[in-house]
A protein has these predicted regions:
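Cytochrome P450 C-terminal beta-domain/meander region
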Residues: 28-42
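Residue-level signal for inorganic ion chemistry
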Residues: 59, 66, 91, 128, ...
């Protein structure tokens, strides 16, 4: 409770709590290369959102999970590009002092990564559903040759593919969240969610852009925001090949 009071007190007032979980070449690793030894934190994290504005950073390390301030001595922030244009950073920790009461008791990198992937999956499912709704409304009201685009068989078939991907992504996300909340093993479902998001969400976003025609490329129109979000989430999770390797590893170990 003392840790909750300390680190979460400002959230209700708008303070940002960000997470530094991924490392160069390793998306959400359960065995981070970042070390926490003798009260000193060392390592590099990438794809850390809003690190500069955050009040605290949740950092996964080899021996636990620690909360540090981005302004602490030994913390260096390097801004990196993102598809959405949002604030994203690489964060380097060099002998950063980690107080004993800043180490989250009972927390592990594996558990934090489970919760992070579940949240990312739910966010992505919402983004795909939003793009589907936006596209369906557009083709229903945009006319060509005297009839709505949605009445053309090819358009309807392409939109159906987007619908299938959207519903299966939502199903995978809901399954993961239910299993985690019920205290059940969710590792297999999480691997499927990660792969389905990274392999299916980007192509259906391309389809939505295609169905919008030139309107989809207009930055004053919201379609590009959905696609940019999915591109960033796919990169955060390591891409489809990386995620497929994790699914294969689970299959070979069972």
């Amino acid at each position: 409770e003392a840790q909750q009071d300390r680190f979460l007190e400002g959230v209700a007032k708008g303070a940002i709590l960000s997470a530094a979980l991924s490392e160069p070449g390793a998306s959400l690793p359960d065995r981070p290369a970042t070390t926490l030894v003798g009260g000193k934190l060392n390592g590099t994290k990438v794809v850390v959102p809003y690190a500069e504005q955050a009040a605290w950073l949740i950092v996964t390390a080899d021996t636990g999970v620690v909360v540090v301030s981005p302004t602490a001595d030994g913390v260096r922030l390097t801004k990196t590009p993102a598809s959405t244009g949002g604030d994203e950073f690489a964060v380097t920790f060099t002998d950063v002092a980690a107080e004993p009461d800043a180490v989250l008791e009972g927390a592990s990198a594996h558990r934090v990564n489970q919760l992070a992937l579940a949240a990312i999956g739910a966010f992505a499912a919402g983004a795909v559903a939003g793009a589907l709704k936006l596209t369906a409304n557009y083709v229903a009201n945009r006319e060509q040759f005297g009839r709505p685009l949605s009445t053309f068989q090819t358009v309807a078939a392409q939109l159906a593919e987007v619908y299938i991907a959207s519903r299966t992504l939502a199903l995978a996300s809901n399954s993961v969240i239910w299993r985690l909340s019920a205290g059940r093993d969710a590792d297999d479902d999480l691997d499927v969610l990660g792969y389905w998001l990274t392999s299916q969400a980007p192509p259906v976003m391309q389809t939505c852009h295609h169905l919008h025609g030139g309107m989809g490329m207009d930055i004053t129109y919201p379609m590009h925001r959905y696609y940019s979000t999915i591109k960033d989430l796919t990169r955060l999770l390591g891409g489809p090949s990386y995620r497929l390797d994790l699914v294969g590893a689970q299959c070979s170990s069972n």
